[in-house]
């Protein structure tokens, strides 16, 4: 099947790029192996903000209810309902993406994509069937996945990434969150609001270390007020799951070691690019030492006709940044091609 443009990845970068390409008169296809809307809409920014809204209401009722005029004898906080609501919010928006694809005449192919030539993509569906798509231009928007050191085993029950944490309906009694970026701090806030004993472990000297120091200072005050424990300047040496119990986490600071015990551990130390097994290197696309796709200011890779946007490039890993990059990529190849 021949197209003007093929977009690999249907997250906020990919689907926006596909829409813009179609609006510019290009015959467009989009491929995703799992979800329309990508991580953001399905298991990332959207459901997490839904949970944060529930958490904000729960925290307000518990801590300031009487002050604000709410009286109750038996307040019941059902976290499973909060999670179900977050799934409903997510699913509604994902359906909206499907509508936008149809409205703009974009062909959707669900399956695993692999570049087999600089103008050809093979798509393998879940049932094993394979199709071959060709295009003048290909936009790579494959995103990123949770980074987990090989020695840490994520079992989805005691040791989690955001992927398992965002959908679990049962609250742990206690949790150690490894990493204090946006994901770690968001889950700390949500779980703490529902009464979970939360400890954040951060290797660097302050929480949200990629933000300005003023942001870290204010957020530290806010989390301390909520009685969320923070251990900065501590490195996680080992995570051990305990049979019929939870986890033991060995942390160190200088020459001192100590063990934290909790029902669960959440690994939130960053992301790795989804660039492996994509065929990018096979067709000559330059990948840096960390696995990110190298691009110029127009989102072009070193291979003419192949573009890359969003998290897989290692730029600012934010949904709206990916969307803006998608529009730039569309403008770039449209200006170059008749």
Descriptions of predicted regions:
Residues 3-30, 184-193:
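N-terminal Rossmann-like FAD-binding beta1-loop-alpha1 element of flavoenzymes
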Residues 9-14, 143, 179-184, 270, ...:
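Conserved phosphate-binding and hydrolysis motifs of nucleotide-dependent enzymes
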Residues 2-3, 19-26, 31-171, 199, ...:
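Glycine-rich flavin
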Residues 12-17, 39, 159, 184-187, ...:
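Short glycine/serine/threonine-rich phosphate/pyrophosphate-binding segments
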Residues 16, 20-21, 40, 138, ...:
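Hydrophobic/aromatic ligand-binding patch that stacks against planar heteroaromatic rings
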Residues 6-8, 113, 133-143, 178, ...:
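Short hydrophobic core segments
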Residues 155-171, 259-337:
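FAD-site-proximal beta/loop scaffold in flavoenzymes
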Residues 177, 182-203:
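Rossmann-like dinucleotide/phosphate-binding beta-alpha-beta segment
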């Amino acid at each position: 099947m021949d197209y003007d443009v093929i977009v690999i990845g249907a997250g906020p970068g990919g689907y926006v790029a596909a829409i813009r390409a179609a609006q510019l008169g290009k015959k467009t296809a989009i491929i995703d192996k799992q979800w329309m809307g990508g991580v953001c809409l399905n298991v990332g920014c959207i459901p997490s903000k839904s949970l944060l809204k529930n958490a904000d209401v729960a925290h307000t009722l518990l801590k300031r209810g009487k002050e604000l005029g709410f009286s109750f004898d038996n307040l019941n906080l059902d976290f499973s309902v909060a999670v179900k609501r977050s799934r409903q919010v997510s699913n509604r928006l994902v359906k909206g993406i499907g509508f936008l694809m149809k409205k703009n005449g974009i062909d959707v192919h669900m399956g695993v994509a692999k570049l087999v030539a600089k103008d050809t993509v093979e798509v393998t569906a879940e049932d094993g069937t394979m199709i071959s798509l060709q295009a003048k231009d290909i936009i790579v928007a494959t995103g990123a996945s949770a980074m987990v050191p090989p020695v840490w085993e994520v079992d989805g029950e005691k040791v989690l990434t955001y992927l398992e944490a965002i959908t679990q309906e049962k609250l742990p009694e206690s949790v150690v969150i490894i990493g204090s970026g946006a994901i770690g701090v968001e889950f700390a806030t949500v779980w703490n609001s529902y009464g979970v004993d939360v400890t954040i472990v951060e290797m660097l000297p302050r929480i949200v270390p990629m933000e300005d120091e003023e942001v870290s200072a204010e957020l530290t005050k806010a989390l301390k007020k909520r009685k969320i424990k923070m251990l900065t300047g501590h490195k996680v040496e080992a995570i051990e799951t305990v049979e019929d119990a939870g986890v033991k986490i060995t942390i160190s600071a200088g020459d001192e070691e100590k063990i934290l015990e909790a029902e669960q551990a959440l690994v939130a130390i960053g992301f790795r690019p989804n660039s492996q097994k994509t065929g990018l290197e096979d067709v000559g696309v330059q990948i840096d030492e960390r696995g990110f796709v190298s691009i110029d200011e127009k989102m072009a890779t070193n291979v003419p006709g192949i573009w890359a946007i969003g998290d897989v490039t290692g730029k600012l890993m934010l949904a709206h940044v990916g969307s803006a990059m998608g529009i730039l990529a569309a403008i770039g190849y449209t200006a170059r091609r008749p």
